[in-house]
Regions:
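Flexible, glycine-rich loop/tail regions that form catalytic "lids" or insertion modules at the edges
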Residues: 1-290
Length: 290
């Protein structure tokens, strides 16, 4: 009762302004003006950013009003394929890779020359290489992204003769061209919800970057289900905000344990509506590339 009878902060402040000669109705007038501004859709506070340029700080307009069924040209010339393949399979003499990793890169070099069929890891690497070479940044984050869940990526080469852990790594995709866009690969902490939430926010602020969160195994997406349900699946219809984040959910590698065989794609199918997301299960290396 005492709390209920006590004047609120607004009343106390309005009374103080009144005692200073600013008028008895100033408090009520400010409330009416504030509510009228909200009803009119006007800004009620000054934006924090001094260079606030439009309704949103990030311009997503080039990506709005498009049809997902429109075909996109994702091919690159054969000469560019070979150039990029050579770049991402060349390891400096100062770096000594593990013998198994060297075999992977030797095979990729053969794939780039056309001497071997392209596998999934090479298809993915070539996709990343063509993007950064064209000026589009790539950001890959997850619990085992450098190596890749199925030991298929090896985006980070560890020098076997290095003396310090933080010195002696080489990332071929960071050495595609002098003026290339950034390629970032992060072995994240083991907190799916925290990492996916961060990457969702990163992607919402940078429409021209391919932002990927990769579950170490697709099953582990259940640790980030709140972010998937509340933001990825429904953020656009709730808040009118689009987001280009990509989730990679490697799964189906039997024999790895009970939590490593299913990405539970049926859950994503249930969340899909009104073109809010694309659910893709590629079956060839070319599909990975394109």
């Amino acid at each position: 009762k005492k709390i209920g009878a006590h004047p609120g902060t607004r009343k106390l402040y309005a009374d103080k302004l009144a005692t200073q000669g600013l008028g008895e109705s100033l408090g009520d007038d400010m409330v009416k003006a504030y509510r009228a501004a909200m009803d009119a859709g006007k800004h009620t506070v000054d934006p924090v950013l001094t260079n606030f340029k439009s309704k949103y700080a990030v311009d997503w307009s080039p990506f709005l009003g498009k049809k997902w069924t429109d075909a996109g040209d994702t091919a690159i010339p054969l000469a560019e394929w070979k150039r990029l393949a050579e770049k991402i399979t060349t390891i400096p003499d100062s770096v000594t890779p593990h013998q198994l990793v060297k075999k992977v890169y030797d095979d990729r070099a053969a794939m780039g020359r056309g001497d071997m069929p392209v596998d999934w890891g090479m298809g993915e690497h070539m996709a990343f290489a063509s993007l950064v070479a064209s000026g589009y940044p790539v950001r890959l984050s997850g619990e085992d992204c450098g190596r890749g869940t199925f030991t298929h990526r090896h985006a980070v080469i560890h020098d076997q003769k290095r003396e310090k852990w933080d010195i002696g790594t080489y990332v071929p995709l960071q050495n595609v061209a002098d003026n290339q866009a950034p390629f970032v690969v992060i072995d994240s902490i083991l907190s799916e919800e925290a990492v996916l939430g961060f990457e969702y926010g990163y992607a919402s602020n940078d429409p021209n970057t391919l932002v990927i969160w990769e579950a170490q195994f697709g099953d582990f997406a259940n640790g980030a289900q709140v972010v998937i349900d509340q933001f990825i699946a429904s953020g656009e219809v709730k808040w009118g905000r689009v987001n280009g984040i990509t989730l990679m959910l490697p799964h189906g590698y039997e024999g790895q344990g009970p939590e490593h065989s299913s990405a539970r794609l049926e859950r994503f199918m249930q969340l899909a509506a009104d073109t809010n997301m694309q659910i893709v299960q590629p079956t060839t290396a070319s599909q990975i590339f394109h």
